[in-house]
């Protein structure tokens, strides 16, 4: 009986969505799906790392596919197709990068490259209706070009700004979080050719749901702000900013699409409020003018953000299931931080004081984090563990693009992915949440707790070994990650057998 049930669950995951060819990406969709990001400056984190924590939300028959693509020297500059007809002149060399791929999706992938530059994003619908683009503009390829070419977060922001101004952005609006081991930026882009980026202060934390969070802007202060030179003038000309009536320019107010009048159910305000409340330890009113960034109550450990990414407003007036008594908390009238459309989650640490194999690390969950566990992953591993991802690891512009949007070949092998087992458990849990959550916490939660508790010693041992024998240190780190993924796979098998 359980075998039949499992087969039924897996069958439900095999529905294939049609995908476009390599020069025709789909129209931007799902713009209001609720991703969520927390950024912690290096002086606000417990260990001096820049931290980026993110829930990715999307819909459809998506594979969460982890890949580590090797650096490549093509020997000559390359001309890149951006997907809708525009061409980009790239250099001869591409950086290696870790790729958290959501197949067929235009705006859902996250990257960490060999220089420790991280790129992820949150949809932030703008009020711009005019599509000002050249040769189809740029959408999907924006973040991948940053991963392939940028050596620092600031360089990535500048490159992204040039790309947006040159080609025009195809989506309604989005905020890209771009970070490295020294600093983090949030870059807000608007349909067409306008953008603005703000640096998160080292001793502060920033939270973003799915609306712009940049408020005051001073483009004369290049250490804190970057952006389109005509940003304010364009807002005035468009009728979105009246200096005489409004006073100082406010980017969110000028460019953001107005949300629903009911702030409790607008999908963003509660999630913003919850992050602020938990990280500051202060009381915030629903609808306050929330700051772009803030000082946390105490220094933030990376692992502590896992609980925040799993949050459903438990213990608040907005806990709509009364502690899971009435079913899944992922499908209620109050859109939660962890929600029905969350497809993956990660907490990334970017550290300047760690040896190369440990400098960029992730806690990665390949589905909704409330019904799975976070597994350790380091950029410095020699290769990804079995079950993490599918597809070749060598760089080829056209092939990687085509495989991403035409994923039938990957889906034909999806039973090899840990992601498939995780989805089967997730489907079972959503149908009987309180009972399954208890089992999941007992099995997966215990293993995750063990991984977190042992992390400091592991990294200390690897650091010491790296000073003596770099190859052996990488080998042991790779074996550790492989072992963690293998044990997790066995635990999912246990959950699916009963």
For each predicted feature, which ranges?
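A contiguous strand-loop segment
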Residues: 26-139, 159-293, 297
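Short, well-structured alpha-helical segments that form the helix of a local strand-helix-strand
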Residues: 156-165, 305-309
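Short, Gly/Pro- and small/polar-rich lid/capping loops
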Residues: 25-37, 321-327, 334
């Amino acid at each position: 009986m359980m075998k039949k049930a499992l087969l039924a669950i897996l069958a439900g995951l095999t529905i294939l969505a049609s995908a476009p060819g390599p020069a025709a990406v789909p129209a931007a969709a799902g713009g209001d799906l609720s991703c969520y990001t927390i950024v912690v400056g290096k002086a606000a984190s417990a260990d001096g790392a820049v931290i980026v924590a993110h829930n990715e939300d999307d819909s459809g028959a998506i594979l969460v596919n982890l890949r580590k693509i090797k650096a490549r020297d093509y020997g000559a500059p390359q001309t890149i197709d951006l997907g809708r007809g525009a061409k980009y002149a790239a250099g001869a060399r591409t950086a290696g990068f870790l790729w958290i791929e959501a197949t067929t999706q235009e705006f859902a992938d996250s990257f960490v490259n060999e220089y420790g530059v991280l790129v992820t994003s949150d949809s932030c619908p703008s009020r711009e209706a005019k599509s000002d683009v050249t040769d189809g503009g740029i959408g999907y390829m924006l973040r991948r070009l940053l991963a392939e070419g940028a050596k620092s977060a600031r360089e990535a922001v500048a490159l992204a700004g040039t790309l947006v101004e040159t080609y025009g952005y195809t989506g309604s609006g989005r905020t890209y979080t771009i970070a490295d081991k020294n600093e983090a930026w949030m870059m807000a882009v608007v349909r067409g050719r306008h953008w603005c980026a703000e640096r998160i202060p080292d001793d502060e934390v920033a939270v973003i749901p799915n609306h712009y969070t940049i408020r005051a802007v001073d483009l004369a202060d290049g250490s804190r702000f970057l952006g389109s030179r005509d940003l304010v003038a364009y807002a005035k000309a468009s009728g979105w900013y009246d200096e005489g009536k409004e006073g100082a320019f406010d980017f969110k107010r000028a460019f953001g699409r107005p949300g629903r009048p009911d702030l409790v159910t607008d999908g963003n305000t509660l999630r913003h409020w919850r992050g602020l409340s938990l990280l500051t330890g202060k009381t915030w009113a629903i609808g306050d003018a929330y700051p772009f960034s803030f000082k946390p109550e105490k220094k933030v450990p990376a692992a502590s953000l896992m609980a925040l990414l799993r949050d459903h407003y438990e213990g608040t007036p907005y806990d709509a299931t009364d502690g899971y008594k009435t079913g899944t908390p992922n499908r209620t009238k109050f859109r939660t931080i962890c929600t029905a459309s969350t497809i993956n989650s990660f907490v990334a640490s970017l550290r300047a004081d760690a040896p190369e194999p440990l400098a960029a690390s992730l806690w990665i969950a390949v589905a909704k984090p409330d019904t799975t566990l976070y597994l350790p992953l380091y950029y410095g591993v020699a290769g990804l563990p079995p079950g993490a991802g599918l597809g070749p690891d060598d760089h080829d512009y056209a092939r990687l693009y085509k495989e991403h949007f035409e994923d039938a070949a990957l889906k034909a092998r999806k039973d090899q992915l840990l992601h498939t087992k995780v989805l089967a458990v997730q489907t079972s849990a959503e149908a009987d949440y309180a009972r399954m959550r208890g089992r999941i916490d007992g099995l997966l939660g215990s293993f995750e707790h063990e991984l977190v508790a042992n992390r400091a010693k592991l990294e200390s041992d690897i650091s010491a070994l790296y000073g003596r024998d770099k190859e052996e240190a990488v080998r042991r780190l790779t074996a550790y990650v492989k072992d963690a993924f293998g044990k997790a796979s066995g635990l999912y098998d246990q959950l699916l057998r009963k």
